[in-house]
């Protein structure tokens, strides 16, 4: 799976939702999402860019296990939970425009 379109009004990205999607490269999480759960992106080894909106207020500590941290860039909102999480966990990040 290279591209995924979220259904309207999705509130969370569930446990193991994208587990092993090795061809997934970029994803934009909609601003209806508040939670990224346990190993939601586990082993998404080709993931290079993820946009996480300010609406996300919880990211499980294992959500990105197995992703290549040195190649993954988070696009976040300044002052958001995602920015704080990225800093605390040493993810590369940039600010959304």
Language model: regions and residue ranges:
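Consensus positions within tandem repeat domains that build extended binding/scaffold surfaces
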Residues: 14-19, 37-42, 61-63
């Amino acid at each position: 799976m290279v591209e995924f379109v979220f259904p309207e009004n999705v509130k969370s990205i569930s446990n193991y939702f994208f587990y092993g999607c090795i061809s997934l490269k970029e994803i934009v999480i909609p601003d209806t999402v508040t939670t990224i759960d346990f190993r939601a992106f586990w082993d998404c080894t080709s993931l290079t860019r993820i946009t996480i909106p300010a609406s996300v207020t919880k990211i499980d500590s294992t959500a990105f296990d197995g992703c290549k941290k040195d190649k993954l860039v988070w696009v976040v909102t300044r002052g958001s939970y995602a920015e704080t999480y990225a800093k605390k966990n040493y993810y590369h990040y940039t600010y959304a425009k």
